[in-house]
Amino acid sequence: MKFIVKPHPEIFVKSESVRKRFTKILERNIRTILQRRTESVAVFNRRDHIEVTSESDKYFKETLEVLTQTPGIHHSLEVQQSEFKDLHNIYEQVLERSGALIEGKTFSVRAKRRGKHDFTSIELERYVGGGLNQAVESAKVKLKNPDITVKVEVENDKLNQVIERHKGLGGFPLGTQEDLLSLISGGFDSGVSSYLHIKRGSKVHYCFFNLGGPAHEIGVKQVSHYLWDKYGSSAKVKFISIDFEPVVAEILENVEDGQMGVVLKRMFMRAGGMVAERFGIEALVTGEALGQVSSQTLTNLRHIDNVTDTLILRPLINWDKEDIIDLSRKIGTEDFAKVMPEYCGVISKKPTVKAKKGKLEAEEAKFNFEVLEQVIENARIMDIRDIEKESQEQAPEVEQVQAVAEHAVVLDIRSPDEEDESPLEIDGVEIKHIPFFKLSTQFGDLDQSKEYLLYCDRGVMSRLQALYLQEQGFHNVKVYRP
């Protein structure tokens, strides 16, 4: 088994010292991943290409996966290598391997040569091509757009016949650019934006603001680990989880409805900037796209950016949602994003699309910033490699009911605004109103001899809150889905 790995062309327009550094990093990245996934596969840096070889094909599939999923590789040539005696011997070997392939088709021969020989690359192409044309009567030479291109490479006394060309990711080798912190939610956008910066050579760490309990966190850990394992596993990166429910509760209690969305995003950026500074990370990356939601207008994005000195990168800023979903499908994150929970949480009824600086600052003056500082202090930090076992877990299920049993109590956990807009009324049933952001502190004060059915509009937040309560030892909770 042998592959000739061609680095991305952008690497070769750089200075000699930078080119050497980039290709050395690429060589190291390939070797690091292959050593973890295979045995007895060697990696050699040959100045303008990298060779990956093994005496057997045992790890062919694993090796090919690594070469097509590692940033910095333009393409990899799968080759059959042999020794040759002279020009005619090259022709004989090419005829043996490619003669049957060109029968009844048009073809051309393309050759590359390294080392000292008594023939040029063009002479090699003409000799082999002419010989094939005479030996295979049904084949015809066609130099432009042929059915088959027979590719050969000669290096000193070795002949490499190209079996197949495998497209790589492109971009720069991982670690050639500075580290980034992805504010990942597990949806389509944040997964794609993280991938784009991995591809461009940055080690991407992941910061997750948890608004929905353990089920959401498990899902986001899974997609983060997937991105790292498939495209960036040559690097050690961190996964940081921050329980943002106290921040949401503070916003819902103190901030005017129309400003909630922008204020929440400003809190995300403040927190992200503080985490980035703690770990010496230069920039944040988000999946925001211009105009996709009310907080993503130019005016609102400017106000969001102003709360931190950390650079904020938005690689999807001018992308259509359809294009984002298409790329997520291609890179394998679509299935994660499709099942990622959505929330009944901080949704302004009339969100501002053009926030005013003075108004935002006045609303944030009501916010207790000690809450934000505390959740950052309590952030859970882990090596993403430790997620592997957890990534196999599935969020536990909680029982859902359509009818209310006798003596059961329905807990409406929607925000006060949602409750006012669409009151829940059920004849003969006791209904209590406890917003989800107060449930963890107030549920223990209820009569625990009763059964409680949690309700919200979509049934997602109620399920997540029920799971959380069960984790705390309360087993008298179910989800009400009429």
From Swiss-Prot:
InterPro entries in the record: Rhodanese-like_dom (IPR001763), Rhodanese-like_dom_sf (IPR036873), Rossmann-like_a/b/a_fold (IPR014729), ThiI_AANH (IPR020536), ThiI_fer (IPR054173), ThiI_N (IPR049961), THII_Thiazole_biosynth_dom (IPR026340), THUMP_dom (IPR004114)
Gene Ontology annotations of biological process type: thiamine biosynthetic process; thiamine diphosphate biosynthetic process; thiazole biosynthetic process; tRNA 4-thiouridine biosynthesis
Residues covered by the THUMP domain: 61-165
UniProt GO cellular component terms: cytosol
Binding site for ATP: 183-184, 265, 287, 296
Top-rank taxon: Bacteria
PROSITE patterns with a match to the protein in the record: RHODANESE_3, THUMP
Record keywords: ATP-binding, Cytoplasm, Disulfide bond, Nucleotide-binding, Redox-active center, RNA-binding, Thiamine biosynthesis, Transferase, tRNA-binding
Active site: 456
EC category name: transferase
Pathway terms, separated by semicolons: Cofactor biosynthesis; thiamine diphosphate biosynthesis
Family note: Belongs to the ThiI family.
Function: Catalyzes the ATP-dependent transfer of a sulfur to tRNA to produce 4-thiouridine in position 8 of tRNAs, which functions as a near-UV photosensor. Also catalyzes the transfer of sulfur to the sulfur carrier protein ThiS, forming ThiS-thiocarboxylate. This is a step in the synthesis of thiazole, in the thiamine biosynthesis pathway. The sulfur is donated as persulfide by IscS.
Name this protein carries in UniProt: tRNA sulfurtransferase
Lineage: Bacteria, Pseudomonadati, Pseudomonadota, Gammaproteobacteria, Vibrionales
Gene: thiI
